[in-house]
Amino acid sequence: MIALSVIILASCTSKPEQKNENKTETPNPFLTEYTTPFQVPPFDQIKNEHYLPAFEAGIAEQQTEVEAIVNNKETPTFENTILPFDKSGKILSRVRNVFFNLNECLTNDEMVAIAEQVLPMLSKHSDAIMMNPKLFERIDYVYQHRNEMGLDDQQIRVVEKYHQDFVRSGAGLTKEQQAELSQINEQLSTLSLQFGNNLLKENANYKLVIDKDWNLAGLPQTSIDAAAEQAKNDGMEGKWVFTLSKPSLIPFLQFANNRHLRKQLYEAYYNRGDNNNEYDNKSLIKQMLELRLKKAQLFGYENFADYVLAVNMAQDSKTVDKFLIDIFKPAQELAKKELAEMQEIAYKECENAENEAIEVQGYDWWYYAEKLRKAKYDFDENYIKPYLTVDNVRNGMFMAANKLYGITFTQNTNLPIYYPDVETYEVKEANGDFLGILYLDYYPRESKSGGAWCTSFRESGHDINGKKIYPVISLVMNFTPASGDTPALLTWDETETMWHEFGHSLHAFFSDGLYSRTCGNVPHDYVEMPSQIMENWVAEPEVIRMYAKHYKTGEVMPDSLITKIENSALFNQGLMTTELIAASILDMKYHEITSIDEIKNLDVDAFEKQQMDAIGLIPQILPRYRSTNFAHIFNGGYSAGYYAYTWAEVLDKDAFNYFKSSGDLFNPELAASFRKNCLQECGNDEGMVQYRKFRGQNPDNEPYLKARGLK
């Protein structure tokens, strides 16, 4: 996942910073250019007290910049209107990038309170700019005369995109409609933050505490050790604590023999935000859906989905609906076959143990799927984990990027970091030219949101004088840390996750352009393609041999294990695809509602069940996210956009097949073309136009269908 519009998630578990009334005021680092190496954020100097004044100063600065544009008496041109607007808001960008990123991965009560204060300020500020009639008048003038001003193609695209932004932000509405829209935007920002805060509280508040070691039967030692460490950290030494974070949750569902405890953990995870307590999200969902529909209707759209999709590759909801259901049907048929095979294993186990037969349920799926993988492919995840240390996987992705693009990654331990175990790397071209800085933040902590994402402390671009601005990118994960003498070991899924987020970082490093509006900016249903394509290289035998080495012996992963990884590539794809598409359909159905009254009368749980019943989702499978914990769409910028992961996967599978069919996984000509057309210049034209420049044709969906086991 990439934080395009930074996802505002926060945890309230850390103690707020204690204020000292006698302390000496320190200079606010956000108010001047950073003086650190490579101008990375001076994390060692930043204090909570700096944020609010910096936001206020940033808003004031950009207001002054906009006023200067508006008050210019000269005829509007690209140079006196579009360019200065494109480069405005430096202070605001500086503080926003740091604050909201740290609020996701190193938050505390004081930062949560600041976010609650700042979000309405930012919403009002944005609306004041985007609905400024005099500013829009100047932008509209340039837009209407863009073909007569001698502008180049990129300048014309920048003008067109800004004009589109202003129109979609309410510049063409009446004053009464603008006032309503401003109120809607402010409310949505607050509700979204609250949804995320509730989810973090739900995550943090649940712990499965085990005090009898026989309840650990079946679990790998690494999971047991991690649970013991968690218990120790929670003041329960001698016990074992399992949480709802994926590194704790998934192994328990895969390997724990205690079915009752598997059910407890499974239900706790899927019921987050739906417990009818102070952190319940159902009311927030209804409020957001109503506000989003009102917003869409202000712009003349029948529903919010069509408003969102109008600027995406898919264009409209009907296209997305057909795309999703055409995949869902064969995916669920595959899932039913997987279920039948697992049920057979369950029956045999019960028969051998002379126990009453069980029917496989959702909380059994991962457990019996693991047994099925062992039976069909002789594949045990615990056999490969010793080869997949965090360091090995990281070095492998660096080597792959070097073979593709010639770039290098050199660790620099002298840069400011925001947490002790964060790593920093200088990224350079093959000729030594500087590309940017990469931060790697691997491990969970109480103050950090769950999941994995790529975000930026500074975006690539150029300043108003044409000077290059180098990106500062961060990959944030939640992997199980080292324990005792055992280093941090990754599952195969976590290995793919790291390479996925790394793909986002390559997109960020390579994106280049003179103008902020188009540099690296792509539609939502394109943005996951640069990340997902890297997941294809990670599983190739040639590549596995580059990085998978046993942490004790240094031995390269043997071919027998690599073959098992290859043979099990389609393992559990029925479930994985079905739950993903089901969640995407649920997202669309929420945002295709056309009636305010329907939303007011909505029962969230009943609506979810109704939509899943309508597509025939089998009861053993839930959508990947249930409504009340679907942060992507209610807290993360993917509303009416979760389908984008699948849409982009069709592109990435086709693109990788192009590499593979060339006979060289690291084909230098194809790599150069992919970098230029799909990463570097991706914002220069529409997504499919840029893709065709690389591929020479529209994407073929055959590679996707084969990779998912659907053909």
Task: List where the protein language model places each region.
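C-terminal, non-catalytic "cap/extension" segments appended to globular domains
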Residues: 20-50, 57, 239-241, 392, ...
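C-terminal motif of bacterial Sec signal peptides marking the signal peptidase cleavage site
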Residues: 8-11
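Short pre-active-site segment immediately N-terminal to the catalytic Zn-binding motif
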Residues: 480-499
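Active-site-proximal, well-structured secondary-structure segments within enzyme catalytic domains
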Residues: 154, 158, 190, 197, ...
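Bacterial signal peptide processing site
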Residues: 13-15
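Short His/Asp/Glu-rich catalytic/ion-coordination signatures at enzyme active sites or charged loops
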Residues: 35-50, 99-118, 141-183, 243-283, ...
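Sec-dependent signal peptide recognition
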Residues: 1-3
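N-terminal helix-rich structural modules
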Residues: 20-220
